[in-house]
Amino acid sequence: MIRPLLTTDLDAAVELWYQASVQAHDFIPATFWREQQAAMRDIYLPASKSWVYEEDGQLLGFISWYQGSVAALFISPDHQSHGLGRQLLEHLKAQYDRLELTVYAENEQARRFYSRNGFKEGEQQLCEHSGRPELVMHWQRG
């Protein structure tokens, strides 16, 4: 079931974000993600509109929107490749006519996922937090 993120979900969402980030970004040290956990819980998630995918009381994934962008889309490593990310992305696409996001250039799996879901790769830039190259991807209804 997809539902809005509640403040009571924050700890579980941050733990899921950490586990999925370490798994998906093996080109960035795990310490980087660990150092970002407090900001994710206290700044980024509260500032965003977020929805979770919950099953049997367990948070399996979440998506966050902030100022026209998909700010986060993370699925528990144990539940990836079962369509949960696509469902969360479709939930967001149903509410907006256009979206953009950034994805690390080295994250081939995420780039393929977003391309399969209608996003087009655009400009390349450096991530302000990690200094790694990332791509801006765009989606527009129509």
Language-model features: locations:
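Conserved beta-hairpin
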Residues: 49-61
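Conserved GNAT-fold acetyl-CoA-binding loop/helix
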Residues: 10, 15-40
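Conserved catalytic-core motifs of GNAT/GCN5-like acyltransferases
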Residues: 102-104, 120-136
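Conserved acetyl-CoA pyrophosphate-binding loop and the N-cap/start of the following alpha-helix
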Residues: 79, 83-91
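A short, internal acetyl-CoA/4′-phosphopantetheine-binding micro-motif in the GNAT/acyltransferase core
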Residues: 66, 70-80, 104
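Conserved GNAT acetyl-CoA-binding A-motif
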Residues: 94-106
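A short helix-loop-beta-strand connector motif used in the catalytic cores of GNAT acetyltransferases and
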Residues: 41-52, 69, 133
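Conserved N-terminal entry element of GNAT/NAT acetyltransferase domains
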Residues: 1-8, 139-142
